[in-house]
Structures are given as C-alpha cells and as structure tokens.
C-alpha cells in the first residue's frame, strides 16, 4: 500500500515533512500534487515553494482541483450542471414534491444532502426503501418519505437534461480509476491542512493510494486519547488501516516564540483536558476589555499598532472574530481610522460590489411583461452611480434631489425626471426587449451589461487592476459565471430559468462573493 499517514498535535512538524516530500518528488520530476483546504493555503504554499525554486512540476490545489484532475485523467466527459442551475432545479422539484416554496437555506441543505447520498453510493431506490421502512416502524411523523421521491425525480431530470452533478461526476471518475488504475499515471498526491476529511475525500485517498497504488501522503492533526481531537477519531480510524506507513510526531514547543513558549505550549497540550494545571502566562495571553464593541476594537487596533511599531510584519498578525455578533463594518471603520493595513476574509452578497449593485438595480428598473415596474428610486440611482457610467457623477445626486422633492419614490416616476434634462435611458428598454424574447436573450443582455459596467471606469486605459479593484473583478467573474450557468439552463430547460429581469435580479442578489 502506498499511503503514508502523518499524525501529531499542532506545530509538531507535519508541514515540514509534507513539504520535504513535495521537494523530493519534484527533484525526481514526479510532478506531485499538494492538496490543501483553502485558496489562501494554495497561495501561501505556492509562494513558499517558489521562494525555493521548487514550483516546476509541482501543483498546489484545493480538493476540487484534485477531483478535476482525476476527472481529466479518467476521461469522464459528462457535462456538469452548474451549482446555480442545480439550485433552480431543486427549488422547482421541492415546490412540486413538498408542496411548498423552499427558501435558499433549505435548498442548499437539500443539495448537500443529495451530494452526501451520492458519495455514500445511496441510490434513490435504496433511500425510498429505507424511508418506507422507517415510516412503517415509527409512524408518519418519523420519516420524510417525500425526500426519496424528490431524489428520484432529481435523478430523472438530470438524465433528461443530459447532465450530471458534481458528486456524480466525481464518483464516476473514481470508479474509472478503480477499473483502469494506469489512467492516473502514478503522480504523487499529498494532503495537508485538513481539519477533517469528508467521505468523498476519503474515497479519493483510498482509490489513489490503495487501488491505483500512487504515492499518497495524508497529514492529520490527531493524537489518541486527546479530548481536542475526539471529533477526528473516526477519520483516523478509517485512515489507519489503509496506511502502509504511519508516522506519529511528538509535540514540539520550539515553534512558539521564546517569551510565549511556556504558556502557549501548555495551552495546546491542555486544551479541553479535565483537571489541567494552570501556569503563569506572562504577556503571552492577554485580555483586552472595552466598554462596548467599538471600544474593544479600538483596544485591538492599538495593540496591533504597537506590534507593527515593534517591527512585526502585518501579514503575521491575525484577528479572529465571531461569525455572528461582530459588526464587520465597524471593524473596517475602526481599523481604517487607526491606519491598520488589513484584508478581510468573509462572504458578502453580490450587490456589495459596485457593479453587482448597479446590475441588480438596473434589472429591477425593467418593467415586467404586465407593464408594471417594481424598481424603486434607489435601484435606478444604484445603476446611475456605477463608477464611470456618468462622466459627471453629480447628475445622479441632482436626480435624487429632484425625485425626492417630487415624491417620485419608484423608478417609473424617476426616469422621466432624468430624461427631461438628459438623454434617454435606453439600456432599460434594451433589457425589456431582451426579456420579451425569452430567458436566453435576457441572460445574454445582462451578461453584456455586467461587462460594460466593469469596463466603464477603465475605458481607453490599458491598466493593471489596483488592489482595491480586485473585489470588482471577483464580482465580474462570479456574475458572469452565474449568468453562464443560467444561460445553459435556459437552453436545456427554459421553464427553470429566470423569466423576468426582476426574477433575475433576485437570483443574482443571492450570489455570495468571498474575499
């Protein structure tokens, strides 16, 4: 067996062993793949390897990149239904099978459930049988038997559309490698940084290492009999029998700075352990307490400013916040006022980007086939205020002032006020004409409008994007990707695609950007 398992606590040297293996494979021109959980990890390890001139032949990917490589080498050519199109299909099926409109959260959870059923190789018939048995044993309140029917309808719809989903394609590719192991070619694969491993990831590890016999290295932060690692015990128990080699690393305190070593090493060794002793922490662990959220953030900002003044690099400082409960806008305001350089990794809606806000506003200004427009004054202004759209941005401010004085709170009444003094807003008419021609035409026009909005402030300038413009580029990429998926859906199943500009605006508003 070609699977090498490396386990140990945090900071025990697992990364060092994995990267040494990457360097060794690269030196022998074996073209290794290093698989890490996040895009930030991809960029970090690419920089580290590039600094050592070890990037030739080395690929650093997220797990999705590994699956794409497996699909390519296995020769699985089925087209995949995009994530947004899949959600539209599931929403339609849920409405029919469950007799209720399902919200975005439910649809995402349903998509994840069906994906896990795929990776566990549970067919619709098997699910229906299990749910029926549950229903017979425990009564109507115990089982959601309609989920089995929904899964079966989903499978039938994919066949009708001539598409598969991501999990289905991945499982077919892994099955192809099991049948013909030589398709992989023997490239080494190394996993590092995963807190835990999902079923599909374990399946890929077993297929590559045990069936294909490719060199596979898996690093897992784990120690037996430690409370902090109890949640990973099941994953370890699945990996251990597959491993031909298992290296257990001992804890190492030298990773920590000398002045913090005693406290932080003790914290790592004692975390969640009952009856752990207390040690003096010195200045390694400090509590900052403010009279309110802003005061607390100001204390954090002052602490960071002190560290920067002492010569610490900004990229070596991390600030962790609660996913819910911390006002991100307040954090940005406080750090900006303190001149703290920072980047914020968070999910945000498509409309947070200037071009996303402008496009959704523009779409809401388009009259429905009935002739009614639900767009508000703010939607029209969001479009007109897109960077570069107006050579004189103050014209939008003037329109807002006149509209509010006239009581024109919707786009229908505000538009004539604009056109009394300025040019006709024909873009709205072009979108309405596209809407009348059908979903495909509407989506094509919306995609072009999004691109023009991105280009508006950059016309006649062959310039590189500044760092603060990368968010807009990300919004452009995400928006065009979503519109392309919807355009494909409009070609395959027009009844599932957004039929009106207003509906399309709602779909785009649900897109999340990550930075």
Where are these predicted regions, by residue range?
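Conserved motor-region signature of P-loop NTPase helicases/translocases
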Residues: 1-47, 184-186, 190, 195-372
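Accessory N-terminal region flanking or inserted into the helicase ATPase core
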Residues: 2-5, 94-193, 200, 204, ...
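Conserved P-loop NTPase-based nucleic-acid remodeling module centered on helicase motor cores
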Residues: 28-142, 152
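Short, polar/flexible loop-turn hinges at active-site or ligand-entry regions and domain interfaces
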Residues: 28-30, 52-56, 73-82, 95-104, ...
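ATPase/helicase motor core of nucleic-acid motors
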Residues: 52-59, 66, 70, 96-98, ...
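Conserved helicase core region in the C-terminal RecA-like lobe
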Residues: 59-66, 188-197, 201, 323-325, ...
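Core structural elements
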Residues: 111-122, 176-177, 321-330, 387-388, ...
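Accessory C-terminal helicase-associated subdomains
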Residues: 141, 145, 154-157, 281-284, ...
């Amino acid at each position: 067996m070609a699977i090498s398992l490396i386990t140990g606590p945090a900071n025990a040297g697992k990364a060092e062993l994995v990267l040494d293996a990457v360097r060794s494979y690269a030196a022998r021109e074996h073209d290794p793949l290093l698989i890490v959980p996040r895009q930030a990890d991809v960029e970090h390890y690419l920089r580290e390897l590039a600094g050592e001139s070890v990037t030739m032949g080395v690929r650093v990917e997220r797990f999705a990149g590994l699956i794409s490589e497996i699909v390519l080498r296995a020769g699985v050519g089925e087209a995949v239904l995009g994530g947004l199109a899949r959600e539209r299909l599931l929403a339609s099926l849920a409405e029919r099978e469950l007799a209720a409109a399902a919200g975005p959260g439910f649809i995402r959870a349903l998509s994840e459930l069906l994906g896990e059923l795929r990776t566990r190789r549970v067919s619709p018939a098997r699910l229906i049988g299990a749910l029926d048995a549950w229903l017979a044993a425990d009564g109507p309140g115990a089982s959601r038997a309609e989920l089995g029917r929904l899964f079966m309808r989903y499978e039938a719809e994919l066949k009708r559309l001539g598409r598969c989903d991501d999990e289905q394609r991945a499982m077919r590719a892994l099955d192809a490698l099991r049948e013909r192991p030589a398709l992989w070619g023997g490239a080494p694969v190394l996993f590092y940084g995963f807190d835990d491993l999902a079923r599909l990831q374990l399946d890929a590890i077993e297929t590559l290492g045990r069936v294909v016999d490719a060199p596979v290295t898996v690093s897992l932060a784990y120690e037996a009999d430690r409370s902090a690692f109890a949640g990973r015990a099941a994953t370890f128990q699945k990996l251990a029998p597959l491993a031909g080699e298992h290296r257990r690393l001992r804890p190492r305190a030298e990773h920590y700075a000398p002045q913090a070593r005693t406290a932080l090493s003790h914290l790592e060794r004692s975390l969640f352990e009952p009856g752990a002793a207390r040690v003096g922490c010195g200045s390694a662990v400090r509590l900052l307490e403010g009279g309110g959220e802003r005061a607390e953030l100001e204390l954090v900002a002052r602490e960071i400013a002190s560290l920067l003044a002492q010569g610490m690099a900004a990229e070596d400082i991390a600030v962790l916040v609660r996913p819910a409960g911390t006002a991100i806008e307040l954090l940005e305001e406080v750090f900006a006022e303190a001149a703290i350089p920072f980047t914020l990794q968070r999910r945000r809606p498509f409309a947070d980007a200037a071009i996303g806000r402008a496009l959704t506003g523009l779409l809401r200004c388009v009259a429905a086939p009935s002739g009614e427009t639900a767009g508000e004054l703010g939607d029209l202004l969001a479009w007109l205020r897109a960077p570069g759209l107006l050579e004189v941005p103050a014209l939008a401010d003037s329109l807002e002032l006149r509209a509010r004085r006239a009581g024109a709170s919707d786009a229908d009444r505000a538009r004539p006020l604009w056109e009394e003094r300025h040019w006709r807003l024909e873009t709205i008419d072009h979108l309405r004409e596209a809407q009348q021609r059908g979903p495909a035409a509407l989506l094509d026009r919306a995609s072009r409008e999004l691109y023009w909005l991105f280009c508006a402030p950059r016309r006649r300038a062959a310039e590189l994007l500044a760092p603060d413009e990368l968010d807009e580029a990300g919004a452009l990429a995400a928006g065009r990707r979503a519109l392309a998926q919807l355009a494909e859906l409009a070609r395959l199943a027009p009844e599932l695609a957004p039929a009106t500009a207003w509906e399309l605006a709602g779909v785009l508003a649900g897109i999340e950007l990550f930075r």
